[in-house]
Each structure stands twice: as structure tokens, then as C-alpha cells.
Amino acid sequence: MFDQKQCEPNPEKLDYTGKVLVLSPNTLKEEYWSPESQLWLAESGFGCSPTARGRSILCTCLGDGEQTRWNRNDFIGVLKDEYLPDWAKEALKQYQRPEQTEKQEMQMGGM
């Protein structure tokens, strides 16, 4: 399971749009406590912005492709790139828009 140690610092100041978020285990039922259920791609919603009044974030689960709405405070934060598992990298290629994929590859050193 992922925790705060694998996340970027100061999540309250970060824009979540297009980022891989770590869902808090406290939000999940115990039977879903797994990395596959914890990693979500933030796509849109007022909750992506750290300064917006709205808290909703529309997301896709990297483990199974489920799309749903979570609140910003349901997440621990943004996963650091070095902790992104290979299975999640593959899922990102499938769910990200092309411009998001290019931007992420540039940030990760052109993987």
C-alpha cells in the first residue's frame, strides 16, 4: 500500500489535473486495500485545483479502469514518479490523453 512517504510534498498546494493520485486506505473498504485500488488518474473537476471551492475530482482507476468521482480530501496526494509501478505506467498509456503522455515522458526523462 502507498502512503505519504511515496507522495509529493505539500499536496494542498498542488494541481491534481493529469496526475496519479494515491487514494487514502481510510476511504477504501478493507477488501480493496491494494495498490491497484489506490492509484487513480485525476482527469477533471474543480477539486483538481488547490484554490477552487469545489472538491470533486473525476478520476480513472489505474487498476481496473473504473471511472468515478472522489473528493480531493479522499486522496493522500500525488504519487512521486519513481514509485509508479510498471503496471500503472502501462495503464497510464491507455487512459491519458496524448498531450498528457508526452508531457509526462518529458518530465520523466523521455522513458
Where are the regions that the model predicts?
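Charge-dense, intrinsically disordered terminal/linker segments
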Residues: 59, 94, 102-104
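A subset of signal/propeptide-processing and intrinsically disordered low-complexity segments
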Residues: 10-13, 76, 100
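Mixed-charge, Lys/Arg-rich low-complexity intrinsically disordered regions
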Residues: 1-29
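Long, compositionally biased low-complexity segments enriched in polar/charged residues
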Residues: 7, 23, 78-82, 88, ...
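Non-Sec secretion/translocation targeting segments of pathogen effectors
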Residues: 98-111
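Acidic, low-complexity, intrinsically disordered interaction modules
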Residues: 25-85
